[in-house]
Curated annotation (Swiss-Prot):
One of its GO terms (biological process) is translation. Belongs to the mitochondrion-specific ribosomal protein mL51 family. The keyword Ribosomal protein applies. One of its GO terms (molecular function) is structural constituent of ribosome. It comes from Gallus gallus (Chicken). This is Large ribosomal subunit protein mL51. Its main location: mitochondrion. The keyword Translocase does not apply. Disulfide bonds: none annotated. Residues 1-52 form a transit peptide. Keywords: Mitochondrion, Ribonucleoprotein, Ribosomal protein, Transit peptide. Pfam families: MRP-L51 (PF10244). InterPro entries: Ribosomal_mL51. Component of the mitochondrial ribosome large subunit (39S) which comprises a 16S rRNA and about 50 distinct proteins.
Amino acid sequence: MAALVRGLMRRVAALPQAVRSVSGGGQRHEPYRPLPITSPLAGLPRNFRVREPPKPQKVDRWTEKRALFGVYDNVGILGGFQIHPKHLIMGPKWLRGWRGNELQRCIRKKQMVGDRMFMDDYHNLKKRIRFLYKRFNRTGKHR
């Protein structure tokens, strides 16, 4: 047994040692050029690369959101400034003429349209109500 261990130790000792140096050692991305001593990079490893800027992406300028941007801007001009564009936007039925925080809003939605919701949406709504209920009861000035 001892002879086996000695034999293995000789093999391990014969392996070449890794060369370490301050300049980084190992394979470089560019040929080695010595830096002047006054350089701010002297003594640092030279294994960093400068990345090129990303290529410009092609953007669809006529998506629905971009095409309809500013669609209600002329309401004041054409309508004699009688109505504000925010009054043209109708929200969901359960929110019209009603104000409240997010928990109250979710509970109201569950009461009014919960029976007609898809199962996944209903499940996510219940999870949100559970989370908000815990949060509102643990923190805030409304405790």
